[in-house]
Amino acid sequence: MSKTRSFVLGLTGLLLLTAACSGDPATTGAPAGRGGGLSKVVLLGDSVAVGEALPMAAAFEASGVEFQSLAADGGGNVVGPFSDEHWEELPEQLAAAEPTVVVYQLTSYDWGSQQEQQAAYDKLLTTVTGVGAQLLFVTTPPIEPDDFYAPHMADLERAPEVARAVAAGSSGRAEVLDAGEVWGSTYQQVRDGVADRSADGIHTCPQGAARFTNWLLARLADRFPGFTPAEARTWANTGWAADDHFKGC
């Protein structure tokens, strides 16, 4: 048995144990493939979301829901550097995707003033609702900033509150999910003896990406009563953890 294979099997056991202890809907035993009113989920974000998209793709497929990642390495943000280039393509991409829900995980590039952040998040809300979808902002995992990120930490720390203000004025078209339930309030590289976050202080490792996926599917089940997430054992051991994106873990 290969080292990678052994790791993924261990991850599966961990997920099942965690979900069973929490009463997570992912372990209800209900059959997969019941999307209810949730037909397609689109993920937006930066390279952190790129890694999380790997188990998400497997989990949504097992749950009978279409999934598409528009997350991007070195970008994917709607405010701050590179965002102008992203906006040139994003409206057409979302229109073509025809999602039910768009998940925007706040990125490590969401730099800008409060006014700039609010304008961008308002624009995202208008764009998402314009294609008939609901917008879910998700807070980013806490990072351990290096010299590149340190000057922008005030912007990143403000971003969730700006997103909440936009959601509060959206008449129910947007919501903010606090992923601190998954990550805690500070960067933690190792959890339960296994690498959960990358040593670079920014990205996730397979265990962390899988825990996030399990949590997100449960939150969607709360909001779409007809949606039954597949049990973790059906998607946590399907080979995605061997992707090169996790080579730093």
What are these regions (language model features)?
Residues 52, 56, 86, 90, ...:
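Stable alpha-helical elements in mature extracytoplasmic
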Residues 37-120, 239, 243:
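Conserved SGNH/GDSL esterase-like catalytic core that processes O-acyl groups on lipids
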Residues 109, 127-157:
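Active-site segments of SGNH/GDSL-like serine hydrolases
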Residues 1-11:
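Bacterial N-terminal signal peptides that target proteins for export
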Residues 17-20:
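C-terminal motif of bacterial Sec signal peptides marking the signal peptidase cleavage site
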Residues 143-249:
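Catalytic His-Asp segment of secreted/periplasmic serine-dependent ester chemistry enzymes
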Residues 22-30:
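Bacterial lipoprotein signal-peptidase II cleavage site
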